[in-house]
Amino acid sequence: MRTAVIIGTGMIGTSIGLALRKQGVDSYLMDTSPVALRIAEAVGAGTAEEPPETVDLAVVAVPPVHVAPVIASHQSRGTARFYVDVAGVKVSTRRELDALGCDLATVVGGHPLVGRPGSGPLAARGDLFDGRPWALVPAVGTDAAALNRALELVAACGAIPVVLDAEAHDRAIALGTLVPQIALTLVAARLTEADSGALRLLGSVWSEIPQLVGVDSATSWTQVLAANAAPVVGELEKLSRDLASLLETLRGVADGDGSLAEPDGRLLEFIQRGIDGSNRVPGRYGIPTETALADVDVSVDDRPAELARLFDDVAGAGVVMRGIDISQRPDSPDRTVTISVTPRDAENLLHELRRRKWPANS
């Protein structure tokens, strides 16, 4: 990838521009806000000039409700060969793209998951995506070259690609981000009725709890919530049943004499289930990552779908990638893909890749 257009210069779009510029990609910036556009250009995310020709990739970093119309508009103008969005909802976005007659073969749904609060180009960082998961959601008819280009984008930004279908993505986002945010919002709403003494007591404690969506990003968040309503309802119903069970247990405890005693076994089971669930999430999102990583280098030729095939084989080996880098070999069109894994996984990955006829070395 040599050229890219970033459409939308908020925190995500500007951070992508910064990461691509670091990799030598010529980045062109577009935004309906002249102020945001000037700031993104000033911080070094790219140029606000029009690209002189069709670019390799357009990254659509706009609010969810605008993704489909923006892609449709730029496809009709021939802005880019391929398109990737970064919205947090995929099923409804694909439905809208289809309704607008977009060429879905050139579009890959994308969604980088970053925990940094903030918005706007001044909150951007070139390393924002380092080691973070980045969902890629190709359609059944997505061109292999489009997916390869999207994988290059993710690698250039230092993120870890996770390829899955739209329904699985939306279920995961409902469970892992939207429902927790809803629960936190409901708890925070109770603070409106707390007395001032309680609020002073809770000040430092509350600041350590994961932050609520801010006013500046509330609109985008509610758009994602509304578009993802069906899977969110399903998860909330499960959560409601768990909460009802917990309430029953706690009522039994509350009816006691109030003395300190060994914890109720059902309460311990409740806590343990949460610990077990958290421990299923790899890397920094649950199980601690070992400080030392091992690299496995794989030579990948420039045939369509080779990058996608490699990542499928890595996943098939049961290995979690902790880092990825793609470099062009100076003497050939082939690329070297460096996959960082735990030392424990490196030997297994090397064996599996060689078994699948990949030229791999550690």
From Swiss-Prot:
It is an enzyme of class 1 (oxidoreductase). The keyword NAD applies. Gene3D superfamilies: 6-phosphogluconate dehydrogenase C-terminal like domain (1.10.3660.10), NAD(P)-binding Rossmann-like Domain (3.40.50.720). InterPro entries: NAD(P)-bd_dom_sf, PDH_N, Preph/Arog_dehydrog, Prephen_DH. It comes from the Bacteria. The keyword NAD applies. Residues 2-283 form the Prephenate/arogenate dehydrogenase domain. GO terms for molecular function: NAD+ binding; prephenate dehydrogenase (NAD+) activity; prephenate dehydrogenase (NADP+) activity. Pfam families: PDH_N (PF02153). Pathway: Antibiotic biosynthesis; novobiocin biosynthesis. GO terms for biological process: antibiotic biosynthetic process; tyrosine biosynthetic process. Keywords: Antibiotic biosynthesis, NAD, Oxidoreductase. Its EC number is 1.3.1.12. NCBIfam families: PRK06545.2-4 (NF005112). Belongs to the prephenate/arogenate dehydrogenase family. Probable prephenate dehydrogenase that produces 4-hydroxyphenylpyruvate (4HPP) in the novobiocin biosynthesis pathway. Novobiocin is an aminocoumarin family antibiotic that targets bacterial DNA gyrases. This is Probable prephenate dehydrogenase NovF. It comes from Streptomyces niveus (Streptomyces spheroides). The gene is novF.
